[in-house]
């Protein structure tokens, strides 16, 4: 906490140099960059605490998001799913790659036996857990469960392999950590052109 306070103090004392220090600050404290950019956008819009004039910011329209469901016992997962449905979620996100893959597939099959794709959209997040030697086979197996998309199936900085995965179209791919750890816009645009993911 002291480190972020110290960095925030340094940024505030050097705010006139924001454009030249922003990238360096982002590498260590992306939350500070988010805060400063939000404050600057608010200032640009007259300081009315409304960054964008949209139906969402006016409170007239919601943003559909997914409900996160944690892997666990079948009864635990079913309870979570029922809670998410009762809260109005039609889309859930499940983290994969942390426990035995066969068990994960069994749990996803269990979910699908209770909720078809029309009742519940399933998105997966692998957090880079799959390896080059198993990613295609694992995604092929997961695709049987009518999966909407998978976030970051492999670890970052494997652009050629990630491009192959996206081109294979076993299921749609969304980037996650790949975007977080790529700081400058030029590299980010090059990466997006090289990989061509279905979602970012």
Regions flagged by a language model, labelled:
Residues 1-122, 127-129, 136, 140-144:
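N-terminal capping/lid subdomain adjacent to the active-site entrance of alpha/beta enzymes
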